[in-house]
Amino acid sequence: MISKNTSFCGFLILVLATCMSAQFVSNESIKLHDILKPSATHRLFDTLQYSVEEQYSDSHLSFDVSTIYNYSEKPISIGKLNKKYRDILFEGDMAISYKQLSMIVNGSTEYRKAIKSRRRGNKINGESTDRTKRQAYLDNNYPATIWKNGVAFMFHESLTPIAKTAILKAVHFWYRETCIEFHPRTFQKEYLLFIGNDDGCWSTVGRDASQGKQVVSIGNGCEHFGVTSHELAHALGIFHEQSRFDRDESVVFNPRVVERDLLFNFAKISPRQMSTYGLPYDIGSVMHYTPTEFSNIPSIPTLAAIDTNLQQTMGQLEGPSFVDVHIMNQHYQCQEKCPTQAPCQNGGFTNSRNCKVCKCPTGFGGAYCQLIASSFSPFCGGYLNAEETTRRFDITIRQSTTTRSKTCVYHIKAPEGKRIIIDILKIDSKCIEGCWQDGLELKMKKDFRPVGYRFCCPESSRRKVISEGNMVPFMVFSKEHDFSVSFEYSFVSTSAGFDDEKNDSDVIVDNLDGVFVSDTSLLQRIGFRRQL
Protein backbone atom coordinates (compact mmCIF):
# COMPACT_ATOMS: atom_id res chain seq x y z
CA MET A 1 0.00 0.00 0.00
CA ILE A 2 1.22 3.51 -0.81
CA SER A 3 1.70 6.12 1.90
CA LYS A 4 -0.50 9.19 1.44
CA ASN A 5 2.62 11.34 1.51
CA THR A 6 4.41 9.41 -1.21
CA SER A 7 5.59 11.61 -4.08
CA PHE A 8 5.57 10.31 -7.63
CA CYS A 9 9.34 9.75 -7.51
CA GLY A 10 9.02 7.82 -4.25
CA PHE A 11 6.11 5.89 -5.68
CA LEU A 12 8.12 5.07 -8.80
CA ILE A 13 11.03 3.75 -6.73
CA LEU A 14 8.65 1.64 -4.64
CA VAL A 15 7.01 0.05 -7.66
CA LEU A 16 10.25 -0.48 -9.57
CA ALA A 17 11.66 -2.27 -6.54
CA THR A 18 8.59 -4.48 -6.47
CA CYS A 19 9.01 -5.12 -10.19
CA MET A 20 12.09 -7.17 -9.37
CA SER A 21 9.81 -9.87 -7.99
CA ALA A 22 8.93 -12.49 -10.58
CA GLN A 23 5.21 -12.51 -9.82
CA PHE A 24 4.90 -8.83 -10.79
CA VAL A 25 5.97 -9.38 -14.40
CA SER A 26 3.95 -11.50 -16.81
CA ASN A 27 5.23 -13.11 -20.01
CA GLU A 28 1.86 -14.55 -21.01
CA SER A 29 0.91 -13.72 -24.60
CA ILE A 30 -2.43 -11.90 -24.55
CA LYS A 31 -4.22 -10.07 -27.35
CA LEU A 32 -7.65 -8.53 -27.72
CA HIS A 33 -9.02 -11.41 -29.80
CA ASP A 34 -8.17 -13.72 -26.90
CA ILE A 35 -10.58 -11.73 -24.73
CA LEU A 36 -13.42 -10.81 -27.09
CA LYS A 37 -15.02 -12.69 -29.95
CA PRO A 38 -16.39 -10.49 -32.77
CA SER A 39 -19.11 -12.99 -33.66
CA ALA A 40 -20.64 -12.56 -30.21
CA THR A 41 -20.52 -8.77 -30.07
CA HIS A 42 -21.50 -7.92 -33.65
CA ARG A 43 -25.15 -8.81 -33.10
CA LEU A 44 -25.30 -6.48 -30.13
CA PHE A 45 -23.47 -3.74 -32.01
CA ASP A 46 -26.07 -4.08 -34.78
CA THR A 47 -28.86 -3.57 -32.24
CA LEU A 48 -27.19 -0.41 -30.95
CA GLN A 49 -26.67 0.77 -34.52
CA TYR A 50 -30.40 0.48 -35.25
CA SER A 51 -31.12 2.29 -31.99
CA VAL A 52 -28.90 5.22 -32.95
CA GLU A 53 -30.36 5.33 -36.47
CA GLU A 54 -33.88 5.46 -35.08
CA GLN A 55 -33.08 8.14 -32.53
CA TYR A 56 -31.37 10.43 -35.03
CA SER A 57 -33.39 9.57 -38.15
CA ASP A 58 -34.62 13.15 -38.56
CA SER A 59 -31.27 14.80 -37.87
CA HIS A 60 -29.61 17.12 -40.36
CA LEU A 61 -25.93 17.90 -40.70
CA SER A 62 -25.42 20.61 -38.07
CA PHE A 63 -22.24 22.43 -37.22
CA ASP A 64 -20.91 25.97 -37.16
CA VAL A 65 -18.43 26.55 -39.99
CA SER A 66 -16.44 28.67 -37.55
CA THR A 67 -15.62 25.46 -35.66
CA ILE A 68 -13.61 24.06 -38.59
CA TYR A 69 -10.00 24.73 -37.68
CA ASN A 70 -6.75 24.56 -39.57
CA TYR A 71 -4.94 22.27 -37.15
CA SER A 72 -1.16 22.55 -36.92
CA GLU A 73 -0.85 18.78 -36.98
CA LYS A 74 -3.08 15.84 -37.86
CA PRO A 75 -5.47 15.26 -34.95
CA ILE A 76 -4.75 12.16 -32.89
CA SER A 77 -7.10 10.30 -30.62
CA ILE A 78 -7.42 7.00 -28.83
CA GLY A 79 -10.04 5.94 -31.36
CA LYS A 80 -7.68 6.60 -34.26
CA LEU A 81 -4.90 4.65 -32.54
CA ASN A 82 -7.33 1.72 -32.25
CA LYS A 83 -8.56 1.77 -35.85
CA LYS A 84 -7.46 -1.84 -36.35
CA TYR A 85 -9.98 -3.00 -33.74
CA ARG A 86 -12.97 -0.85 -34.68
CA ASP A 87 -15.05 -3.96 -35.34
CA ILE A 88 -14.65 -5.35 -31.83
CA LEU A 89 -14.06 -2.47 -29.39
CA PHE A 90 -17.02 -0.55 -27.99
CA GLU A 91 -16.75 3.23 -28.43
CA GLY A 92 -13.25 2.87 -29.79
CA ASP A 93 -11.38 1.60 -26.73
CA MET A 94 -13.57 -0.44 -24.37
CA ALA A 95 -13.24 -4.23 -24.25
CA ILE A 96 -16.77 -4.89 -23.05
CA SER A 97 -17.74 -8.42 -22.06
CA TYR A 98 -20.76 -9.98 -23.76
CA LYS A 99 -22.73 -9.87 -20.49
CA GLN A 100 -21.90 -6.22 -19.87
CA LEU A 101 -22.64 -5.23 -23.47
CA SER A 102 -25.97 -7.08 -23.32
CA MET A 103 -26.92 -5.03 -20.26
CA ILE A 104 -25.97 -1.83 -22.07
CA VAL A 105 -28.02 -2.78 -25.13
CA ASN A 106 -31.07 -3.76 -23.06
CA GLY A 107 -30.80 -0.63 -20.94
CA SER A 108 -30.41 1.59 -23.98
CA THR A 109 -33.46 0.02 -25.65
CA GLU A 110 -35.62 0.37 -22.54
CA TYR A 111 -34.46 3.93 -21.91
CA ARG A 112 -35.28 4.93 -25.48
CA LYS A 113 -38.79 3.55 -25.00
CA ALA A 114 -39.04 5.40 -21.69
CA ILE A 115 -38.12 8.68 -23.33
CA LYS A 116 -40.86 8.13 -25.91
CA SER A 117 -43.27 7.45 -23.05
CA ARG A 118 -42.17 10.62 -21.27
CA ARG A 119 -42.88 12.65 -24.38
CA ARG A 120 -46.42 11.34 -24.12
CA GLY A 121 -46.55 12.56 -20.52
CA ASN A 122 -46.32 9.14 -18.88
CA LYS A 123 -44.29 8.13 -15.84
CA ILE A 124 -41.66 5.42 -15.46
CA ASN A 125 -41.98 3.19 -12.40
CA GLY A 126 -44.30 5.80 -10.94
CA GLU A 127 -41.81 8.65 -11.33
CA SER A 128 -41.08 11.16 -14.03
CA THR A 129 -38.01 10.29 -16.10
CA ASP A 130 -36.74 13.83 -15.49
CA ARG A 131 -35.22 12.46 -12.30
CA THR A 132 -32.59 10.56 -14.27
CA LYS A 133 -30.49 13.69 -14.47
CA ARG A 134 -29.76 13.42 -10.76
CA GLN A 135 -28.40 9.90 -10.87
CA ALA A 136 -24.82 8.65 -10.94
CA TYR A 137 -22.17 6.60 -12.76
CA LEU A 138 -23.08 3.04 -11.70
CA ASP A 139 -24.78 -0.08 -13.04
CA ASN A 140 -27.14 -2.61 -11.49
CA ASN A 141 -24.24 -4.51 -9.88
CA TYR A 142 -22.82 -1.47 -8.06
CA PRO A 143 -20.88 -1.43 -5.74
CA ALA A 144 -19.57 -4.86 -6.76
CA THR A 145 -18.13 -3.20 -9.88
CA ILE A 146 -15.68 -1.00 -7.97
CA TRP A 147 -12.37 -2.07 -6.46
CA LYS A 148 -13.33 -1.58 -2.80
CA ASN A 149 -10.32 -3.51 -1.50
CA GLY A 150 -7.80 -1.69 -3.67
CA VAL A 151 -6.41 -2.35 -7.12
CA ALA A 152 -3.67 -4.91 -7.59
CA PHE A 153 -1.78 -4.45 -10.85
CA MET A 154 1.12 -5.95 -12.75
CA PHE A 155 3.10 -5.37 -15.95
CA HIS A 156 3.55 -7.52 -19.02
CA GLU A 157 7.16 -7.91 -20.07
CA SER A 158 6.34 -6.34 -23.45
CA LEU A 159 5.77 -2.87 -21.97
CA THR A 160 8.40 -0.30 -22.86
CA PRO A 161 10.02 1.80 -20.12
CA ILE A 162 8.15 4.86 -21.45
CA ALA A 163 4.84 2.99 -21.26
CA LYS A 164 5.55 1.83 -17.71
CA THR A 165 6.31 5.38 -16.61
CA ALA A 166 3.10 6.69 -18.22
CA ILE A 167 1.08 3.94 -16.51
CA LEU A 168 2.65 4.65 -13.13
CA LYS A 169 1.90 8.36 -13.53
CA ALA A 170 -1.75 7.47 -14.09
CA VAL A 171 -1.80 5.11 -11.11
CA HIS A 172 -0.22 7.73 -8.89
CA PHE A 173 -2.63 10.42 -10.15
CA TRP A 174 -5.77 8.40 -9.38
CA TYR A 175 -4.30 7.39 -6.03
CA ARG A 176 -3.46 10.98 -5.08
CA GLU A 177 -6.75 12.49 -6.29
CA THR A 178 -9.10 9.84 -4.82
CA CYS A 179 -9.34 7.36 -1.95
CA ILE A 180 -8.51 4.39 -4.21
CA GLU A 181 -5.59 2.26 -3.08
CA PHE A 182 -3.18 0.63 -5.53
CA HIS A 183 -0.51 -1.99 -4.93
CA PRO A 184 1.69 -4.19 -7.11
CA ARG A 185 0.20 -7.65 -7.45
CA THR A 186 1.57 -10.47 -5.36
CA PHE A 187 -0.89 -13.38 -5.36
CA GLN A 188 -4.26 -11.63 -5.84
CA LYS A 189 -6.72 -13.41 -8.14
CA GLU A 190 -8.38 -10.15 -9.24
CA TYR A 191 -5.98 -7.64 -10.75
CA LEU A 192 -5.17 -5.38 -13.70
CA LEU A 193 -2.60 -6.61 -16.20
CA PHE A 194 -1.05 -3.86 -18.31
CA ILE A 195 0.22 -5.20 -21.64
CA GLY A 196 2.18 -3.72 -24.53
CA ASN A 197 2.36 -6.66 -26.94
CA ASP A 198 -0.90 -5.82 -28.75
CA ASP A 199 -1.93 -2.86 -30.88
CA GLY A 200 -3.81 0.06 -29.43
CA CYS A 201 -4.99 1.51 -26.15
CA TRP A 202 -7.99 -0.24 -24.63
CA SER A 203 -9.39 -1.48 -21.35
CA THR A 204 -12.21 -3.32 -19.65
CA VAL A 205 -14.72 -1.21 -17.67
CA GLY A 206 -14.97 -1.54 -13.91
CA ARG A 207 -14.17 -4.50 -11.69
CA ASP A 208 -15.46 -7.81 -13.03
CA ALA A 209 -14.87 -10.60 -10.52
CA SER A 210 -15.75 -13.23 -13.12
CA GLN A 211 -12.71 -12.25 -15.21
CA GLY A 212 -10.17 -12.25 -12.42
CA LYS A 213 -7.36 -10.88 -14.56
CA GLN A 214 -8.46 -7.73 -16.42
CA VAL A 215 -6.30 -6.50 -19.28
CA VAL A 216 -5.38 -2.89 -20.09
CA SER A 217 -3.45 -2.41 -23.33
CA ILE A 218 -0.92 0.41 -23.68
CA GLY A 219 0.47 -0.27 -27.14
CA ASN A 220 2.63 1.74 -29.48
CA GLY A 221 1.55 5.41 -29.55
CA CYS A 222 -0.40 5.14 -26.30
CA GLU A 223 2.49 5.99 -23.95
CA HIS A 224 1.08 9.31 -22.79
CA PHE A 225 -0.41 10.30 -19.43
CA GLY A 226 -3.61 11.53 -21.07
CA VAL A 227 -4.11 8.08 -22.59
CA THR A 228 -3.06 5.97 -19.60
CA SER A 229 -5.19 8.01 -17.17
CA HIS A 230 -8.13 7.59 -19.58
CA GLU A 231 -7.73 3.82 -19.87
CA LEU A 232 -7.20 3.38 -16.14
CA ALA A 233 -10.37 5.41 -15.53
CA HIS A 234 -12.23 2.85 -17.66
CA ALA A 235 -10.75 0.02 -15.61
CA LEU A 236 -11.91 1.80 -12.46
CA GLY A 237 -15.46 1.98 -13.81
CA ILE A 238 -15.92 5.19 -15.81
CA PHE A 239 -17.59 5.35 -19.24
CA HIS A 240 -17.01 8.02 -21.89
CA GLU A 241 -18.46 11.46 -21.23
CA GLN A 242 -20.32 11.64 -24.55
CA SER A 243 -22.10 8.39 -23.64
CA ARG A 244 -24.12 10.27 -21.02
CA PHE A 245 -27.85 9.99 -21.49
CA ASP A 246 -28.12 13.80 -21.26
CA ARG A 247 -25.44 14.56 -23.87
CA ASP A 248 -27.89 16.05 -26.41
CA GLU A 249 -28.22 19.07 -24.12
CA SER A 250 -24.53 19.86 -24.65
CA VAL A 251 -23.45 18.48 -28.04
CA VAL A 252 -25.05 17.84 -31.42
CA PHE A 253 -24.35 14.47 -33.03
CA ASN A 254 -23.93 14.42 -36.82
CA PRO A 255 -24.64 10.80 -37.87
CA ARG A 256 -24.41 11.65 -41.58
CA VAL A 257 -20.60 11.80 -41.43
CA VAL A 258 -20.26 8.42 -39.67
CA GLU A 259 -20.17 5.11 -41.51
CA ARG A 260 -23.35 3.18 -40.82
CA ASP A 261 -21.61 0.18 -39.26
CA LEU A 262 -19.83 2.50 -36.78
CA LEU A 263 -22.95 4.27 -35.49
CA PHE A 264 -23.12 1.93 -32.48
CA ASN A 265 -20.21 3.89 -31.00
CA PHE A 266 -22.55 6.84 -30.45
CA ALA A 267 -25.21 5.00 -28.46
CA LYS A 268 -26.06 6.63 -25.16
CA ILE A 269 -25.74 4.61 -21.96
CA SER A 270 -28.96 4.46 -19.97
CA PRO A 271 -29.25 5.46 -16.29
CA ARG A 272 -29.28 1.75 -15.45
CA GLN A 273 -25.60 1.46 -16.35
CA MET A 274 -24.45 5.07 -16.04
CA SER A 275 -24.99 7.80 -13.48
CA THR A 276 -23.81 11.40 -13.28
CA TYR A 277 -24.01 12.23 -9.56
CA GLY A 278 -25.61 15.52 -10.53
CA LEU A 279 -22.31 16.71 -11.97
CA PRO A 280 -22.36 18.85 -15.12
CA TYR A 281 -21.55 17.56 -18.58
CA ASP A 282 -17.87 18.34 -19.16
CA ILE A 283 -16.83 18.77 -22.80
CA GLY A 284 -13.25 19.13 -21.53
CA SER A 285 -13.26 15.72 -19.84
CA VAL A 286 -10.36 13.43 -20.73
CA MET A 287 -13.11 10.82 -21.20
CA HIS A 288 -14.73 12.78 -24.05
CA TYR A 289 -14.39 11.93 -27.75
CA THR A 290 -12.49 14.30 -30.00
CA PRO A 291 -14.78 16.41 -32.26
CA THR A 292 -13.97 14.37 -35.37
CA GLU A 293 -14.01 10.87 -33.84
CA PHE A 294 -15.25 8.34 -36.44
CA SER A 295 -15.91 11.11 -39.00
CA ASN A 296 -15.44 10.02 -42.62
CA ILE A 297 -14.92 13.68 -43.56
CA PRO A 298 -11.95 14.78 -41.41
CA SER A 299 -12.85 18.48 -41.45
CA ILE A 300 -16.45 17.97 -40.31
CA PRO A 301 -17.09 17.12 -36.64
CA THR A 302 -19.23 14.20 -35.56
CA LEU A 303 -19.84 16.05 -32.30
CA ALA A 304 -20.45 19.80 -32.29
CA ALA A 305 -20.76 21.75 -29.05
CA ILE A 306 -24.09 23.55 -28.77
CA ASP A 307 -22.13 26.38 -27.17
CA THR A 308 -19.68 26.85 -30.04
CA ASN A 309 -17.17 28.51 -27.72
CA LEU A 310 -16.58 25.06 -26.22
CA GLN A 311 -15.68 23.38 -29.51
CA GLN A 312 -11.92 23.78 -29.05
CA THR A 313 -12.24 22.42 -25.50
CA MET A 314 -13.33 19.00 -26.80
CA GLY A 315 -10.81 16.19 -27.24
CA GLN A 316 -8.02 17.12 -24.84
CA LEU A 317 -5.38 14.52 -23.95
CA GLU A 318 -3.71 16.47 -21.15
CA GLY A 319 -5.27 14.39 -18.40
CA PRO A 320 -8.36 14.11 -16.18
CA SER A 321 -10.38 17.26 -15.56
CA PHE A 322 -11.72 18.40 -12.20
CA VAL A 323 -15.12 16.88 -13.03
CA ASP A 324 -13.43 13.57 -13.94
CA VAL A 325 -11.79 13.55 -10.52
CA HIS A 326 -15.03 14.50 -8.77
CA ILE A 327 -16.96 11.70 -10.49
CA MET A 328 -14.33 9.14 -9.51
CA ASN A 329 -14.47 10.31 -5.89
CA GLN A 330 -18.25 10.02 -5.88
CA HIS A 331 -18.14 6.62 -7.57
CA TYR A 332 -15.81 5.26 -4.87
CA GLN A 333 -17.72 7.01 -2.04
CA CYS A 334 -14.52 8.73 -0.97
CA GLN A 335 -16.13 11.56 0.98
CA GLU A 336 -17.73 9.03 3.32
CA LYS A 337 -14.23 8.52 4.72
CA CYS A 338 -14.40 12.01 6.25
CA PRO A 339 -16.50 12.39 9.45
CA THR A 340 -17.21 16.01 8.50
CA GLN A 341 -17.06 17.79 5.18
CA ALA A 342 -14.83 20.83 4.63
CA PRO A 343 -16.62 24.14 3.84
CA CYS A 344 -15.57 24.12 0.19
CA GLN A 345 -16.36 27.07 -2.06
CA ASN A 346 -16.63 27.60 -5.81
CA GLY A 347 -17.59 23.99 -6.54
CA GLY A 348 -14.81 22.30 -4.59
CA PHE A 349 -15.27 19.09 -2.57
CA THR A 350 -13.65 17.51 0.48
CA ASN A 351 -10.27 15.85 -0.03
CA SER A 352 -10.67 12.33 1.39
CA ARG A 353 -6.92 12.06 2.01
CA ASN A 354 -6.96 15.24 4.09
CA CYS A 355 -10.49 15.96 5.29
CA LYS A 356 -9.61 19.48 6.43
CA VAL A 357 -9.03 20.78 2.91
CA CYS A 358 -10.77 20.72 -0.46
CA LYS A 359 -10.14 19.59 -4.01
CA CYS A 360 -10.58 22.71 -6.11
CA PRO A 361 -11.74 23.46 -9.66
CA THR A 362 -9.03 24.70 -12.00
CA GLY A 363 -8.28 28.34 -11.25
CA PHE A 364 -8.93 28.14 -7.51
CA GLY A 365 -6.72 27.42 -4.52
CA GLY A 366 -6.56 27.77 -0.76
CA ALA A 367 -7.79 25.26 1.81
CA TYR A 368 -11.43 25.85 0.82
CA CYS A 369 -11.03 26.97 -2.82
CA GLN A 370 -11.64 30.53 -1.67
CA LEU A 371 -8.48 31.92 -3.28
CA ILE A 372 -6.99 32.21 -6.74
CA ALA A 373 -4.73 29.30 -7.70
CA SER A 374 -1.01 29.98 -7.77
CA SER A 375 0.81 30.69 -11.03
CA PHE A 376 4.11 29.23 -12.14
CA SER A 377 5.83 32.60 -11.69
CA PRO A 378 5.37 35.48 -9.20
CA PHE A 379 5.45 37.81 -12.20
CA CYS A 380 2.16 36.64 -13.66
CA GLY A 381 -1.30 35.87 -12.36
CA GLY A 382 -3.56 37.81 -10.03
CA TYR A 383 -6.79 39.79 -9.94
CA LEU A 384 -7.98 42.15 -12.66
CA ASN A 385 -10.81 44.63 -12.18
CA ALA A 386 -13.20 45.08 -15.09
CA GLU A 387 -14.47 48.60 -15.71
CA GLU A 388 -17.10 50.13 -17.97
CA THR A 389 -14.31 51.43 -20.17
CA THR A 390 -12.48 48.77 -22.13
CA ARG A 391 -9.11 47.58 -20.89
CA ARG A 392 -6.59 45.58 -22.89
CA PHE A 393 -4.66 42.51 -21.75
CA ASP A 394 -1.69 41.00 -23.59
CA ILE A 395 0.45 38.08 -22.51
CA THR A 396 3.17 35.98 -24.09
CA ILE A 397 4.62 32.89 -22.45
CA ARG A 398 7.85 31.71 -24.01
CA GLN A 399 9.49 28.31 -23.77
CA SER A 400 13.25 27.91 -23.66
CA THR A 401 15.21 24.98 -25.08
CA THR A 402 14.13 23.00 -21.99
CA THR A 403 10.34 23.12 -22.04
CA ARG A 404 8.25 22.98 -18.88
CA SER A 405 4.62 23.50 -17.99
CA LYS A 406 3.85 27.17 -17.37
CA THR A 407 0.43 28.42 -16.26
CA CYS A 408 -0.61 31.93 -15.28
CA VAL A 409 -3.93 32.18 -13.40
CA TYR A 410 -6.06 35.32 -13.29
CA HIS A 411 -9.51 36.29 -12.01
CA ILE A 412 -11.37 39.17 -13.66
CA LYS A 413 -13.88 40.74 -11.29
CA ALA A 414 -16.77 43.11 -11.92
CA PRO A 415 -19.29 44.70 -9.51
CA GLU A 416 -22.26 42.61 -8.39
CA GLY A 417 -25.00 42.49 -11.00
CA LYS A 418 -22.58 43.03 -13.89
CA ARG A 419 -21.30 40.71 -16.58
CA ILE A 420 -17.88 40.64 -18.21
CA ILE A 421 -17.33 40.89 -21.96
CA ILE A 422 -14.06 39.60 -23.42
CA ASP A 423 -13.10 40.40 -27.01
CA ILE A 424 -10.26 38.13 -28.19
CA LEU A 425 -8.13 40.21 -30.55
CA LYS A 426 -5.35 37.83 -31.49
CA ILE A 427 -4.06 34.35 -30.67
CA ASP A 428 -0.64 33.10 -31.73
CA SER A 429 -0.29 29.42 -30.90
CA LYS A 430 -0.11 25.87 -32.15
CA CYS A 431 -3.65 24.82 -33.09
CA ILE A 432 -4.60 21.30 -31.93
CA GLU A 433 -7.83 19.54 -30.96
CA GLY A 434 -8.62 20.12 -27.31
CA CYS A 435 -6.10 22.99 -26.95
CA TRP A 436 -4.34 21.01 -24.25
CA GLN A 437 -0.72 21.85 -25.02
CA ASP A 438 -0.84 25.64 -25.10
CA GLY A 439 -3.80 27.99 -24.90
CA LEU A 440 -6.23 30.28 -23.12
CA GLU A 441 -9.04 28.94 -20.92
CA LEU A 442 -11.89 31.27 -19.93
CA LYS A 443 -14.45 30.17 -17.33
CA MET A 444 -17.46 32.22 -18.41
CA LYS A 445 -20.15 30.14 -16.67
CA LYS A 446 -21.32 30.53 -13.07
CA ASP A 447 -20.47 26.87 -12.54
CA PHE A 448 -16.67 26.82 -12.34
CA ARG A 449 -16.35 23.02 -12.22
CA PRO A 450 -16.27 22.04 -15.93
CA VAL A 451 -13.39 22.98 -18.22
CA GLY A 452 -14.11 26.40 -19.70
CA TYR A 453 -13.77 27.91 -23.15
CA ARG A 454 -10.38 26.94 -24.54
CA PHE A 455 -8.80 28.78 -27.44
CA CYS A 456 -5.52 28.03 -29.19
CA CYS A 457 -6.29 28.50 -32.89
CA PRO A 458 -5.75 31.76 -34.79
CA GLU A 459 -9.32 31.43 -36.12
CA SER A 460 -10.51 32.35 -32.61
CA SER A 461 -9.30 35.93 -33.08
CA ARG A 462 -12.04 38.56 -33.09
CA ARG A 463 -14.32 36.34 -31.01
CA LYS A 464 -16.44 37.90 -28.26
CA VAL A 465 -17.70 36.04 -25.21
CA ILE A 466 -19.79 37.23 -22.27
CA SER A 467 -19.88 35.82 -18.75
CA GLU A 468 -22.89 34.56 -16.83
CA GLY A 469 -21.72 36.14 -13.58
CA ASN A 470 -19.45 38.91 -12.35
CA MET A 471 -16.23 36.86 -12.12
CA VAL A 472 -14.19 35.14 -14.82
CA PRO A 473 -11.26 32.92 -13.80
CA PHE A 474 -8.91 32.39 -16.72
CA MET A 475 -5.72 30.48 -17.31
CA VAL A 476 -2.99 31.10 -19.86
CA PHE A 477 -0.83 28.02 -20.25
CA SER A 478 2.13 26.78 -22.24
CA LYS A 479 3.46 23.25 -22.07
CA GLU A 480 5.47 22.88 -25.26
CA HIS A 481 5.40 26.02 -27.42
CA ASP A 482 5.34 29.78 -27.15
CA PHE A 483 1.84 31.15 -26.62
CA SER A 484 0.53 34.67 -27.07
CA VAL A 485 -2.94 36.17 -26.69
CA SER A 486 -4.41 39.67 -26.69
CA PHE A 487 -7.92 40.55 -25.59
CA GLU A 488 -10.03 43.44 -24.33
CA TYR A 489 -12.42 43.26 -21.40
CA SER A 490 -15.04 45.41 -19.70
CA PHE A 491 -18.27 44.98 -17.78
CA VAL A 492 -21.87 45.60 -18.78
CA SER A 493 -25.22 45.28 -17.05
CA THR A 494 -26.79 41.83 -16.95
CA SER A 495 -29.31 42.82 -19.63
CA ALA A 496 -26.81 44.38 -22.03
CA GLY A 497 -25.53 42.83 -25.24
CA PHE A 498 -22.07 43.15 -26.76
CA ASP A 499 -20.47 46.58 -26.90
CA ASP A 500 -17.90 47.25 -29.62
CA GLU A 501 -16.52 50.50 -28.17
CA LYS A 502 -12.77 50.44 -27.62
CA ASN A 503 -10.67 52.47 -25.20
CA ASP A 504 -7.09 51.19 -24.97
CA SER A 505 -5.27 51.49 -21.67
CA ASP A 506 -1.55 52.17 -21.39
CA VAL A 507 0.56 49.24 -22.57
CA ILE A 508 3.03 47.96 -20.00
CA VAL A 509 5.41 45.04 -20.37
CA ASP A 510 6.86 42.59 -17.87
CA ASN A 511 9.40 40.17 -19.34
CA LEU A 512 10.52 38.27 -16.26
CA ASP A 513 10.50 34.44 -16.23
CA GLY A 514 9.78 34.40 -19.95
CA VAL A 515 6.39 36.04 -19.43
CA PHE A 516 5.35 39.24 -21.16
CA VAL A 517 2.21 40.83 -19.68
CA SER A 518 0.40 44.04 -20.61
CA ASP A 519 -2.17 45.34 -18.15
CA THR A 520 -1.83 48.61 -16.26
CA SER A 521 -3.63 47.61 -13.07
CA LEU A 522 -1.86 44.25 -12.82
CA LEU A 523 1.66 45.64 -13.17
CA GLN A 524 0.97 48.43 -10.71
CA ARG A 525 -0.12 45.74 -8.26
CA ILE A 526 3.15 43.80 -8.57
CA GLY A 527 5.18 47.02 -8.50
CA PHE A 528 6.83 46.61 -11.90
CA ARG A 529 6.23 49.46 -14.33
CA ARG A 530 8.10 50.13 -17.54
CA GLN A 531 6.80 52.08 -20.51
CA LEU A 532 6.97 50.03 -23.73
Curated annotation (Swiss-Prot):
Gene Ontology terms: biological process: molting cycle, collagen and cuticulin-based cuticle; proteolysis
A Pfam family this chain is assigned to: Astacin
Keyword Disulfide bond: yes
Recorded superkingdom: Eukaryota
Keyword Transmembrane helix listed: no
Functional note: Metalloprotease.
Protein name: Zinc metalloproteinase nas-29
Species of the source: Caenorhabditis elegans
Name of the gene this protein is made from: nas-29
